[in-house]
C-alpha cells in the first residue's frame, strides 16, 4: 500500500484530516480501508471511513461502516442515527426504519422523528409523514421545509411555494431551497420564474465552485470529471440543470435542452444520478435507440428511478416496432404498471402493443381514447373562451389563463399520439384517403400544431396528384427556419417540397431550396469540418428516386451517384437506404429485360458501389437489435456487404444482357 508507506510515523491522523479537508476522499478512503483491515475495531478509522463514504454519497458502504460501529459500540446512539441515515439515502426505507426505531436517546429524539418522517415521505406515506412532522418544534426551519415538501407531493404547489419562501427568509439563501422554489414554479407552469432561479443557482455555482467546470464541456474544453460529493449535492447544480432540461424539453427547445446535459459538472457515467441518466436517455431516443433503451432498461432495474422511466421505455419500444418486448415488460412489471402508468398511458400502450395482432380491438380502444381526449379539449377550449371574454388584467387571472392554455396544450399532446396511432393503421395499408379523413376531423383543434401539419402534408404528398396542396402545408414548416436554420428542418420535408415544386413546374423555387441547403452545408462544414451533413444528399437522392420511378433510370441513377460524392462524407444510414432502393429497382428491371441502360451509366454505378466498400464498414444498415446476433449475421448488416452484393448482382444482369 504505497499511500501508507508514504505516511510518516505519528502523522497518520493529520494526514487523513488534511486529505479530507482538501476533499481528496478517495485517497483518504484507500488509507482508511487499509487501516481498517489491519485493525477492524479501530473506532477512529472506521468512523472516518464511514464519513468519507457518506460524503462521496456511497451510502451503502457508509451504512456498512456505521452498522459495524453501532454493533461494536451499542451505547453510542449517534452511530445508529448515522446508520439509519445512510440506509435512507441508499433507498432502503424498511431497513432504515428498523434501525431508527431502536434509538432510545432523548437527545436524538427530534433527529429520529425527522428521519422517520423522511422515510415515510420516501415511501409515499404522506399521512403518517405529516403526523410525525407535526410532533416537531414549530420554530425549526427544517420543519417548515418538510411541511412544504409534503404539500408539494400532495400537489399543493402554491402552499409549498409559500412555505419554501418563508424558509428562505428564515434561513437565508440556500441553493437547495432555491431549487425547491424553482420546482414549484415549474409545476405551476411559471417557467420564466423557474428559469430565473435556476440561472441564479448556476451563476452562484460558477462563482463559488470553479472546480466543477460548469459549461466547459459544451465549449469543447477537455476537463477532469467531478466526483459525487456532499458539496456538489448542496450546490443543487445537477438538480438545477436537470430542471432546466425539463423546461426546454417540454417547450421543444431541444438544442438548449441538450446543452443543459453538457453544461452540468462532468461526471463518469457510473456516477450519474437516476434523473440525469433518464434525461440523457430521452435526449438520444430519436438518434440512438440502442443507447437510449439500454439506459432506460438499466434504470428500471435500479432503486429508485424516475417514475417516467417505465412509460418512456415502453413507448420507445413501440415507436421502434418492438411490440413484443413492450408486451413482455408490461406483463413482467404489474406493480410498475399500476404505479407508473396512468389510465391514458396504459390504454394507449395496449392499443399500440396489440395493433399488429388484434387491430379491431386496438381500434376500439383508440376510438374510446379519441372521444375522451376530444371531450377534455372542448371543455378547456370553452373555459379559455370564457376567460377571454372577461378581459381582466388581474395578475392571478393572467396566470390562470396561462395555466388554462398550458392545460389545453398538454391535452393536445395527449390527443396527438392517439390520432397518429389511429392514422398509422391506415397509413400502413396505404389508405391515404382514410388518413386524410381522420386529420380533417381533427382540424378544429390541431390545425396550428406543427406535428399535425407535417403529417397532413405527408399524407397529401403520398396521394401523388395533390402536390400543389401538399406544398401549401410544407411551405410554412420550411419558411419558419429557411433563412437561418434550414439544416434544422428534416431533410425529407425539404426533399418532398422540392418534389412538389418539380411536379408543379416551379423549378425556380426548387433550385432556390437546393442552393440554400448547399450554402448552409458549406458554412456548417467550415465550422465543423469533421461533421457529416446529409440534407443536400437526401434531397438529391429523392429527386433521383423520383426520376427512376418515372422510368428515367439513366438520369435518376446519375443523380443518385452524384448525390453521394464523396462517399466518405456523404455515406450514412439514410443516404444509403435511398440509394440502394434505386439500384435494386434498376437491377430488377434489367433482370426482367424491361430496362436497358447505357454501359457508361452501369459502370458509373459499379464504380460508385466499389467506392462505398471502405467507408461503409462501420455503417450498419439495420437498427441496433436488442437480441444478440451471431458474428456472421452482423457482418452482413453493413453498407460494405450490401454494396458488394449489389455490385455482384448488377454485374450478373449486365453481362447476362
From Swiss-Prot:
TPR repeat residues: 9-42, 43-76, 141-174, 175-208, 238-271, 384-417, 418-449, 451-484, 537-570
GO biological process, one term: protein polyglutamylation
UniProt-listed SUPFAM superfamilies: TPR-like
Subcellular location: Cell projection, Cilium
Keyword RNA-binding: no
Keyword tags: Cell projection, Cilium, Cilium biogenesis/degradation, Coiled coil, Repeat, TPR repeat
Signal peptide: none
Domain of life: Eukaryota
UniProt keyword Membrane present: no
Gene Ontology CC annotation, any one: intraciliary transport particle B
Listed GO MF terms: intraciliary transport particle B binding
Function field: Required for polyglutamylation of axonemal tubulin. Plays a role in anterograde intraflagellar transport (IFT), the process by which cilia precursors are transported from the base of the cilium to the site of their incorporation at the tip. This protein is specifically required for the kinesin osm-3 to dock onto and move the IFT particles which contain these precursors.
Protein name: Tetratricopeptide repeat protein 30 homolog
Gene behind this protein: dyf-1
Amino acid at each position: 500500500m504505497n499511500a501508507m508507506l508514504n505516511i510518516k510515523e505519528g502523522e497518520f491522523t493529520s494526514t487523513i484530516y488534511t486529505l479530507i479537508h482538501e476533499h481528496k476522499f478517495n485517497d483518504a478512503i484507500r488509507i482508511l480501508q487499509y487501516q481498517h483491515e489491519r485493525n477492524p475495531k479501530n473506532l477512529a478509522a472506521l468512523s472516518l471511513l464511514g464519513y468519507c463514504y457518506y460524503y462521496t454519497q456511497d451510502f451503502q458502504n457508509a451504512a456498512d461502516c456505521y452498522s459495524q460501529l453501532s454493533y461494536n459500540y451499542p451505547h453510542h446512539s449517534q452511530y445508529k442515527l448515522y446508520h439509519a441515515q445512510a440506509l435512507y439515502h441508499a433507498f432502503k426505507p424498511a431497513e432504515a426504519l428498523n434501525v431508527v426505531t431502536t434509538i432510545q436517546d432523548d437527545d436524538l429524539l427530534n433527529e429520529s422523528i425527522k428521519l422517520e418522517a423522511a422515510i415515510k415521505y420516501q415511501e409515499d406515506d404522506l399521512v403518517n409523514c405529516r403526523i410525525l412532522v407535526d410532533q416537531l418544534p414549530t420554530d425549526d426551519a427544517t420543519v417548515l421545509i418538510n411541511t412544504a415538501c409534503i404539500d408539494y407531493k400532495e400537489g399543493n404547489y402554491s402552499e409549498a411555494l409559500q412555505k419554501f419562501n418563508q424558509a428562505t427568509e428564515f434561513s437565508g439563501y440556500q441553493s437547495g431551497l432555491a431549487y425547491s422554489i424553482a420546482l414549484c414554479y415549474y409545476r405551476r407552469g411559471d417557467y420564466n420564474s423557474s428559469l430565473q432561479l435556476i440561472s441564479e443557482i448556476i451563476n452562484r455555482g460558477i462563482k463559488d465552485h470553479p472546480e466543477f467546470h460548469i459549461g466547459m464541456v459544451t465549449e469543447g474544453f477537455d476537463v477532469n470529471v467531478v466526483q459525487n460529493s456532499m458539496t456538489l449535492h448542496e450546490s443543487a447544480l445537477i438538480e438545477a440543470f436537470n430542471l432546466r432540461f425539463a423546461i426546454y424539453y417540454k417547450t421543444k427547445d431541444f438544442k438548449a435542452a441538450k446543452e443543459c446535459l453538457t453544461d452540468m459538472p462532468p461526471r463518469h457515467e457510473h456516477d450519474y444520478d437516476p434523473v440525469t441518466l433518464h434525461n440523457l436517455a430521452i435526449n438520444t431516443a430519436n438518434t440512438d435507440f440502442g443507447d437510449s433503451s439500454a439506459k432506460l432498461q438499466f434504470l428500471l432495474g435500479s432503486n429508485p428511478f424516475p417514475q417516467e422511466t417505465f412509460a418512456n421505455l415502453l413507448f420507445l419500444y413501440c415507436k421502434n416496432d418492438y411490440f413484443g418486448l413492450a408486451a413482455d415488460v408490461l406483463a413482467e412489471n404489474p406493480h410498475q404498471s399500476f404505479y407508473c402508468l396512468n389510465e391514458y398511458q396504459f390504454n394507449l400502450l395496449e392499443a399500440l402493443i396489440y395493433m399488429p395482432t388484434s387491430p379491431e380491438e386496438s381500434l376500439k380502444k383508440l376510438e374510446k381514447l379519441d372521444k375522451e381526449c376530444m371531450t377534455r379539449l372542448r371543455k378547456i377550449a370553452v373555459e379559455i373562451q370564457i376567460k377571454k371574454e372577461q378581459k381582466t388584467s388581474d395578475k392571478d387571472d393572467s396566470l390562470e389563463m396561462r395555466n388554462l392554455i398550458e392545460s389545453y396544450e398538454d391535452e393536445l399532446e395527449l390527443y396527438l399520439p392517439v390520432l397518429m396511432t389511429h392514422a398509422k393503421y391506415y397509413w400502413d395499408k396505404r389508405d391515404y384517403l382514410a388518413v386524410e379523413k381522420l386529420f380533417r376531423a381533427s382540424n378544429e383543434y390541431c390545425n396550428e400544431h406543427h406535428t399535425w401539419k407535417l403529417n397532413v402534408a405527408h399524407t397529401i404528398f403520398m396521394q401523388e396528384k395533390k402536390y400543389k396542396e401538399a406544398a401549401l402545408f410544407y411551405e410554412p414548416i420550411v419558411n419558419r427556419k429557411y433563412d437561418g436554420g434550414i439544416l434544422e428542418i428534416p431533410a425529407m420535408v425539404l426533399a418532398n417540397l422540392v418534389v412538389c415544386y418539380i411536379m408543379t413546374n416551379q423549378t425556380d423555387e426548387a433550385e432556390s431550396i437546393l442552393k440554400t441547403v448547399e450554402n448552409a452545408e458549406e458554412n456548417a462544414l467550415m465550422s465543423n469540418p469533421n461533421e457529416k451533413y446529409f440534407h443536400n444528399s437526401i434531397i438529391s437522392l429523392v429527386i433521383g428516386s423520383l426520376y427512376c420511378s418515372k422510368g428515367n433510370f439513366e438520369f435518376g441513377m446519375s443523380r443518385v451517384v452524384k448525390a453521394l460524392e464523396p462517399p466518405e462524407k456523404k455515406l450514412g444510414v439514410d443516404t444509403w437506404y435511398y440509394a440502394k432502393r434505386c439500384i435494386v429497382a434498376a437491377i430488377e428491371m434489367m433482370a426482367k429485360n424491361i430496362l436497358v441502360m447505357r454501359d457508361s451509366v452501369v459502370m458509373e454505378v459499379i464504380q460508385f458501389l466499389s467506392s462505398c466498400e471502405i467507408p461503409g464498414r462501420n455503417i450498419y444498415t439495420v437498427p441496433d437489435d436488442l437480441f444478440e446476433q451471431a458474428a456472421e449475421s452482423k457482418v452482413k448488416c453493413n453498407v460494405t456487404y450490401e454494396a458488394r452484393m449489389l455490385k455482384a448482382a448488377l454485374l450478373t444482369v449486365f453481362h447476362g444482357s
